[in-house]
């Protein structure tokens, strides 16, 4: 019969082994590819979020995020600029300049703006600038405009990245963009924001994912899954893997282990679930994958995409 100390060690080990998944410590470092930071108390205020959004309209800075993210295994984050004000790109670059936790930012520029080339070249000279995000409708307009196409080509020529946000139709736009600019790295934001009712995903979305992922220069974020679950009608406090499994299976079968990344969409993501719940979903899904595949999705692919 084991002595008392050995028995205590066995019980402690067993308890850790059989804890529910959400109580387990993180098993791999996370490079969060999607956070927003802003300060409504600035003299000029902010264009987003609006004052009517009481949960978001507050000062949100990196130190606030680090307090809750680091204990979950987050080692750094890519900031996504939500403000359309050109100078807010510089505000973020200044915020990130001396912070090793923030290896890169994705700005917000309009390729149909007359001063776009000037703005892009200016920001591209700064070490942490990696490109900009655009919504689906504006990208469509740019692709239909001669100057817009030239400006997107400039983005590619400078070795920068394009992130695209919107609903499932954005996947068709991404397909066209990837065909026209095969050297431009493109990131689908929030898995194309398909409302998830916990059943089989919409055919439009599934077909779009297959089309977009057929281009090696296109990556996709596992992000806003909890938000999509809420949009699809989920009412529980904790969004479980089973509710999102079908969506994750499509993403995995489309992009594989080398072109998926993880993003929290913090602080917006907290409207749908806790930061822990947000990261628990891909963690649980990837439990059956190899250690190399888990590292790829949680940090390695982001390092390759953003060059950090």
State the predicted function of each range:
Residues 54-58, 88, 144, 201, ...:
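Residue-level preference for long, well-ordered alpha-helices that form the structural scaffold
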Residues 84-85, 112-114, 138-142, 194-197, ...:
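Short, small-residue-enriched loops and turns at beta-alpha junctions
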Residues 2-33, 53, 58-76, 249-250, ...:
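Mid-to-C-terminal alpha-helical segments outside catalytic/metal-binding sites
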Residues 24-158, 164, 168, 242, ...:
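Mid-domain alpha/beta scaffold segments of enzyme catalytic cores
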Residues 35, 82, 191, 265-266:
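Active-site metal-binding loops of divalent metal-dependent hydrolases
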Residues 41-46, 118-119, 199-201, 232-234, ...:
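Short aromatic-enriched loop/helix-cap "lid" or pocket-rim segments at secondary-structure transitions
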Residues 141-261:
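Catalytic pocket-lining loop regions of alpha/beta-barrel enzymes
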